[in-house]
Regions:
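Catalytic-loop region of hydrolases
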Residues: 29-102, 107
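Short, surface-exposed "cap/lid" segments of acyl-processing enzymes
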Residues: 84, 89, 98-137
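Gly/Ser-rich "nucleophile elbow"/oxyanion-hole loop immediately N-terminal to the catalytic nucleophile
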Residues: 98-108, 178-199, 220-223
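Conserved alpha/beta-hydrolase
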Residues: 135-155
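Alpha/beta-hydrolase active-site loop
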Residues: 163-185
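Gly/Ala-rich beta-loop-alpha elbow adjacent to hydrolase catalytic centers
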Residues: 200-204, 208
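A conserved short beta-strand
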Residues: 221-232
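Accessory cap/linker subdomain of secreted extracellular hydrolases
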Residues: 231-299
Length: 299
C-alpha cells in the first residue's frame, strides 16, 4: 500500500529511491512525463459552473450537494505499454480539490478514476476538450478525479484497442501511478490517501470492470479498491454482444462492429485479416479508424 506524506527532510531521498525502484520493478511504466494546467476555479466559481452546466441538461428537480472545493484541472502525460508490451506515451486528466482558505491542516483526498464512454476521435477526450461537468462535481465533493484517455486517444498514437481488457487495465494503472507520483513528489499542495474508487460508463463500464480484475490479479499489493461501480458496459462480449452484432437487424450505431473487429484483428493477428471478415466494398473502413474520423462519418 502506498502512503504518501510530504516532509522537507526525506522528499528528495524518497524520490530518488522511488525512481530507482520504478526502473527495477516497473520499467518506465507509470513514469510522469509532463503536466499542463487546463483550468482552475475557486469554490464559488466551481459551484456557479456546475449550476450553469446542469441547467442545460437536467430539470430543476435534480439536485446535488454544493461544491466544497474548487479545482485544478491538469493534463497528464505519462508512460505505459502498448498492446505489444512496448513503452508507449499516453495522456489523461487529473482534477485536484483546490483549497483557498488559510490555516487548513493537510488534507489527503481519495482518488476516483473515471473511465469514459465510447469515442472514436482522438480529440474527443477531456485532455483535449478541457473542462466538463463531471470532474467539477466530483472534485468539488472532495475527490481527486482521474480520467485516462486510453491508448490510441488523446496524444497516444495508433489505433484505440476498443473493448480489449489488458490495454484498459495497464493504461489506467499506469496513470494512477503517475498521479500518485505527482501528488507525492512534484506538487506539495496535492496529498492523496489510499482510497481508490473506480467508475465508468458504456465503454468505460467495461474498462472499469477490466481494470478492477487486473488490479486484483496483478497489483493488489499496490492498490486497494475501495468501491468499484462499472455502468452499462458490454461485459458479455462472446455472448450477448456477439448475438447483437450478428443478428439480421439494422443497428443504430453500426460503427461499433468494425471498431471492435479492427481492434481485435490488431491485437490478435492470428484470427485473420480484414478481407476475411468484410465484403470488398467495406474493407476501406479500416483506414477510417485512425482517430481522425467521427462515428457519424463512419456510420
Amino acid at each position: 500500500m502506498f502512503q504518501y506524506k510530504h516532509t522537507a527532510n526525506n522528499q528528495y531521498q524518497t524520490g530518488i529511491f522511488l525512481a530507482i525502484l520504478s526502473c527495477i520493478v516497473f520499467g518506465a511504466r507509470g513514469d510522469l512525463i509532463s503536466t499542463e494546467i487546463l483550468a482552475t476555479r475557486n469554490v464559488i466559481n466551481t459551484q456557479t459552473y456546475i449550476e450553469e452546466e446542469l441547467a442545460q441538461i437536467v430539470t430543476d428537480m435534480f439536485a446535488i450537494d454544493p461544491a466544497q472545493y474548487g479545482y485544478w484541472l491538469y493534463k497528464i502525460t505519462y508512460e505505459t505499454i502498448d498492446i505489444h508490451g512496448n513503452i508507449h506515451i499516453a495522456t489523461g486528466t487529473v482534477s485536484y480539490p483546490r483549497v483557498d482558505w488559510p490555516d487548513v491542516p493537510d488534507q489527503a483526498f481519495p482518488i476516483l478514476s473515471y473511465q469514459h464512454g465510447t469515442v472514436v476521435e482522438k480529440s474527443d477526450v477531456t485532455s483535449v476538450i478541457g473542462e466538463w461537468i463531471l470532474p467539477a462535481i466530483l472534485t468539488g465533493a472532495g475527490y481527486v478525479y482521474v480520467e485516462p484517455d486510453y491508448l490510441g486517444l488523446g496524444d497516444s498514437e495508433g489505433m484505440h484497442p476498443y473493448q480489449l481488457k489488458e490495454p484498459y487495465g495497464t493504461a489506467v494503472v499506469d496513470m494512477l501511478r503517475a498521479v500518485r507520483y505527482y501528488a507525492a513528489f512534484e506538487n506539495e499542495q496535492f496529498v492523496v490517501n489510499d482510497q481508490l474508487f473506480l467508475a465508468g460508463y458504456s465503454e468505460g463500464g467495461y474498462a472499469t470492470m477490466a481494470t478492477h480484475q487486473i488490479i486484483e490479479r496483478d497489483y493488489s499489493d499496490e492498490f486497494d479498491i475501495t468501491v468499484s461501480f462499472p455502468m452499462a458496459g458490454a461485459y458479455s462480449l462472446s455472448g450477448i454482444m456477439t448475438d447483437v452484432m450478428l443478428e439480421q437487424q439494422p443497428y443504430g450505431q453500426p460503427f461499433y462492429f468494425p471498431y471492435i473487429l479492427f481492434a481485435y484483428l490488431n491485437f490478435y493477428p492470428s484470427i485473420g485479416t480484414v478481407e476475411q471478415y468484410l465484403l470488398p466494398e467495406y474493407v476501406f473502413l479500416a483506414d477510417w479508424f485512425d482517430g481522425y474520423h467521427s462515428s457519424g462519418e463512419i456510420n
